[in-house]
Regions:
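Glycine-rich nucleotide-binding loop
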Residues: 96, 136-143
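Short beta-strand/loop element within the Bergerat-fold HATPase_c
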Residues: 72-84
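Short beta-to-alpha transition helix within the HATPase_c
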Residues: 11-29
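Conserved short strand/loop->alpha-helix "switch" segment adjacent to the catalytic nucleotide/phosphoryl-transfer site
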Residues: 7-11, 33-53
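Conserved ATP-binding N-box helix of the HATPase_c
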Residues: 47-70
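Glycine-rich ATP-binding loops of the HATPase_c
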Residues: 128-138
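Glycine-rich/acidic phosphate-handling loop/turn and adjacent ATP-lid/helix
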Residues: 84-114
Length: 149
C-alpha cells in the first residue's frame, strides 16, 4: 500500500485516481512529490485528454528522476484555473543530455521522437493553448495555459 492510498487531490474521481497512481509510482522510487491539482468542474479539455496531459508529464518526470541522487528526486506538479485560463506546471530535475531534433524532443527510452511530450503538445494546440518547455542545466519545466470555454 502506498502512502497516497486515499489521498484526495481533486473531486474528479478519474483524475484523482490517475494522480494517486503517479504519486504511488514516484513514492516507490523514493521521489518526493508535491502535487496540487484543482480539477473539479471547469476542465479546459475533455477528461480523457486532460489525463493524456497529466499522465505523460508525470511519467516523463518520474522517469527522469529515478536515476538521480535521492536528494534531487523531486517533482512539483500544479494545475489550477486562473481567470479564463487553466494553468499546468510540471517541474523535475534530470541528469544527462536532453536531445532535440528541430522542435521535437527525442526519446530517452528508444530511438526517435518522444511521443509523450508530443501528445501533450497536440492536446494543448487542439484547444488553442500555449505550452513552453524550459530546459535548464538540471531542471526541466513545462508550463501550459489552456483557455476555458
Amino acid at each position: 500500500k502506498g502512502r497516497s492510498q486515499g489521498t484526495l487531490f481533486c473531486k474528479n474521481t478519474v483524475i484523482n485516481a490517475l494522480l494517486q497512481y503517479y504519486e504511488d509510482n514516484a513514492d516507490q522510487s523514493e521521489i518526493k512529490t508535491v502535487i496540487r491539482v484543482c480539477a473539479d468542474e471547469n476542465l479546459p479539455v475533455p477528461e480523457v485528454e486532460f489525463c493524456i496531459i497529466i499522465g505523460n508529464l508525470l511519467e516523463n518526470a518520474i522517469d527522469a528522476s529515478r536515476p538521480l541522487a535521492r536528494e534531487k528526486r523531486k517533482i512539483e506538479f500544479y494545475g489550477k484555473q486562473e481567470g479564463a485560463m487553466y494553468l499546468i506546471s510540471s517541474v523535475n530535475y534530470y541528469e544527462g543530455e536532453i536531445r532535440k531534433r528541430g522542435r521535437r524532443f527525442q526519446s530517452s527510452k528508444h530511438t526517435g521522437n518522444g511521443v509523450g511530450i508530443w501528445s501533450v503538445e497536440r492536446v494543448v494546440e487542439k484547444y488553442n493553448g500555449m505550452m513552453t518547455i524550459d530546459v535548464g542545466e538540471e531542471k526541466f519545466e513545462v508550463k501550459i495555459a489552456i483557455p476555458i470555454e
